[in-house]
Amino acid sequence: MASDSSFPGASSNVAEYSVSEISGALKRTVEDTFGHVRVRGEISGYRGPHSSGHAYFALKDDRARLEAVIWRGSMSRLRFRPEEGMEVIATGKLTTYPGSSKYQIVIEQMEPAGAGALMALLEERKQRLAAEGLFDPALKQLLPFMPRVIGVVTSPTGAVIRDIIHRISDRYPLRVIVWPVRVQGDTCGPEVATAVNGFNTLPDDGPIPRPDVLIVARGGGSLEDLWGFNDEIVVRAVAASHIPVISAVGHETDWTLIDLAADMRAPTPTGAAEMAVPVKADLQASLASQSARLSSAMSRFFDQKRQAHRAAARAMPSADQLLALPRRRFDEAASRLTRALFVNTQKKRVHFDGHARQLSPRLLQRRLVELERGVTMLGQRLPRALEAFLRERRTAFTHRANRLSPEPILRRTRLTGSTLEQLDRRRDQAVRLLIERVKRRSQELDRLMRTLSYESVLERGFAVVFDAQGKPVKQAAAVSPGDALSIRFRDGDVGVVARAGLTIPDPTKGQ
């Protein structure tokens, strides 16, 4: 059996290590040799901090890959937020992980690998978000002219918030609500986005008033310092805000993606305050100027209208001139109406007098007597006429009875008897109706006669003058002085003698 010395190297002086020993030796060698290194590479596999606060990813270049870890304490001290694909310079120490024969870098500090790398990443993000329409000018909102509440997203300490509040107080004092955030570091972007979204979710009638305009502000700094305002979640929050947003990040020469998404960009935080509120003194001066101009314009307007009114009044005829022709027509119509009424009254009086002369009492009495006589004669003649008619019919019936059978004769006799009875009843009814009509007519004529007779005039308080022959005196010219006259009143006659020169006043003229 061959001895162990037959194997190659069995008698060499190479030290023998266990797996743990060699792993520990490697760990000490790596940590001692590379205790503090700076590594440049591209971040790969970055998913943000773990729930523990640590971050695990890798640094790579074209030919190699190095695992990396940032503990929670170091993560909170970073001045920017790491992102996938960002080229960085990491400072830390190398260590191995014996359990899996892997080595990694424990990063203590990390910074972007120059402005060029950040600008390239920034340009790529800008193009991608612009393609989504987040920077579309059509989405921009107008700033309110007179906001009631202004919301400010910035650090609660520092000169920025003091400058904003001081500038607003100088221009137009109003309520300012500050949402405190970190304006640098890994948590800057999420906190700013949370603040913008939080202001938008405030109800209009809640205990905290909803701002009318937002100011997102930060002082100047390097690209790395301002990198949190290039965060995609910040850009999306500002673009989706229903409240107008003014971006005031950095100095006038600085720019971030939030400037493109905001509704207005201010060169400085102080400039943002000036954009948000007007100057109260300027408003008062403008209001006074506008008021003076309005008063002057109204004064000129009323002066012009007053002059135009006076000119129109001078050109128009006076009221007397306007009413002269209608007044003349009215007077002529009134005169014609008076004459027409007088003439019509005279015609009616003449017509009435003519009918009154025809309706003398004796004539009416004679007419009534004639009507009564006619009715009496008709009443006397009607029975005799009926008896004669019946005799004639009876003779004819008797003559025909000799030639006809009894039955038809009996039927016709009964029918004729019924007809005669009806005629007899109708005769009596006709006589009664005729007598009633004559009576009504006589009564009407009697009432008319009484109305037209001079006795009715006497009943109303008038008197009738008769001459010596007993004729009515119709005109004063028919009476001579010394004539004997008789005045008939309602209750009797009085004899008088006419005298000359006596004038009795007209009672109607004294009314």
UniProtKB/Swiss-Prot annotation:
Subcellular location: Cytoplasm
An example Gene Ontology biological process: DNA catabolic process
InterPro entries: Exonuc_VII_L, Exonuc_VII_lsu_C, OB-fold_nuc-bd_dom
GO cellular component: cytoplasm; exodeoxyribonuclease VII complex
The keyword ATP-binding is assigned to this record: no
Keywords from the UniProt entry: Cytoplasm, Exonuclease, Hydrolase, Nuclease
EC number per UniProt: 3.1.11.6
Catalytic activity: Exonucleolytic cleavage in either 5'- to 3'- or 3'- to 5'-direction to yield nucleoside 5'-phosphates
Described function: Bidirectionally degrades single-stranded DNA into large acid-insoluble oligonucleotides, which are then degraded further into small acid-soluble oligonucleotides.
Assembly: Heterooligomer composed of large and small subunits.
NCBIfam families per UniProt: xseA
Family: Belongs to the XseA family.
Name used for this protein in its record: Exodeoxyribonuclease 7 large subunit
Name of the gene this protein is made from: xseA
